[in-house]
Regions:
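Helix-loop junction within the histidine kinase core
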Residues: 85-96
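A conserved beta-strand-to-alpha-helix junction within the catalytic ATP-binding
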Residues: 95-110
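Short conserved segment of the HATPase_c
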Residues: 184-198
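Short alpha-helical segment of the dimerization/phosphotransfer core of two-component systems
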Residues: 69-74
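Primarily the dimerization/phosphotransfer
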Residues: 14-48
Length: 257
């Protein structure tokens, strides 16, 4: 007959095994994500070094642009991995400030517009919006992730709608980012916020990503005591982020999350 202590040891061993497997899975996924752009960069760099004189100017420019794009992909992946590492170590310092949302949305839309020049961005705000209490850097990252996702998964010359509204009864501010992109199947809705989760379809395979953006977004929203949800049909998705309206006593508070 097993003692109570032996059950505790077995349970701890199982937890340790699960943690070890999670770490192995994480390393395997990161290695794959790093290997893909690095292989591309090395391949095109080798071609330029060994066959430069035989390539046309157009081919050289094309290969250099591929190297640049894959380098940017690597930088984005490393930045996301550093963010994930901070969040999981519970050493992420949050410095809260009371802010007006519209200027942050306007600035982020302008940044995204420079990347997706054919898209149209429609922005609407309620009048007399209350302020919200957030870490400004983290809030900007949330905005950029959501607007970039809406743009990335939509065809050229698509429209992205961004709205900020007040829910008077619940004293909250609701940020909505809506697109007319490829949509998300109902069976995938609960998966999209998971780490390294990407919907596998012929359309999504053509779009670069590492499956960390929405995981980071959801984690940051929840660390700042907000909520995030998504609705999607056959075409288009709408992400909503909800924050409580600011209170004066919260301004300037710091927290390590």
């Amino acid at each position: 007959m097993k003692s109570k202590n032996s059950y505790i040891i077995v349970t701890m061993d199982e937890k340790q095994n699960n943690l070890d497997q999670a770490h192995l899975d994480f390393i395997s996924t990161v290695s794959h994500e790093l290997r893909t752009p690095l292989t591309s960069i090395r391949g095109f760099a080798d071609t330029l070094l060994t066959s430069y004189d035989r390539l046309t100017p157009e081919q050289r420019e094309k290969f250099l642009n591929i190297i640049k794009d894959q380098s940017n992909r690597l930088i984005n992946l490393v930045e996301n991995l550093l963010t994930v590492s901070k969040m999981q170590s519970d050493k992420e310092l949050m410095i809260y400030k009371s802010i007006d949302v519209p200027p942050f949305v306007d600035a982020c839309v302008q940044m995204i517009k420079n990347q997706y020049k054919t898209h149209k961005y429609v922005v609407n705000y309620d009048k007399n919006l209350p302020k919200i209490m957030v870490d400004t850097d983290k809030f900007q990252q949330i905005l950029l992730n959501l607007i970039d996702n809406a743009s990335k998964y939509s065809k050229e010359a698509s429209t992205v709608w961004i709205s900020v509204n007040q829910n008077y009864s619940e004293n909250t501010v609701i940020l909505s980012v809506k697109d007319e992109g490829i949509g998300i199947a109902q069976e995938d809705i609960n998966k999209i916020f998971n780490k390294f989760s990407r919907i596998d379809s012929p359309l999504t395979r053509k779009i670069q990503g590492n499956g960390l953006g929405l995981y980071i977004t959801k984690t940051l929203v929840e660390k700042m005591n907000g909520e995030i949800c998504v609705e999607s049909k056959e075409k288009g998705s709408e992400f909503k982020v909800i924050f409580k309206s600011a209170t004066p006593e919260d301004d300037g508070k710091k927290a390590i999350c």
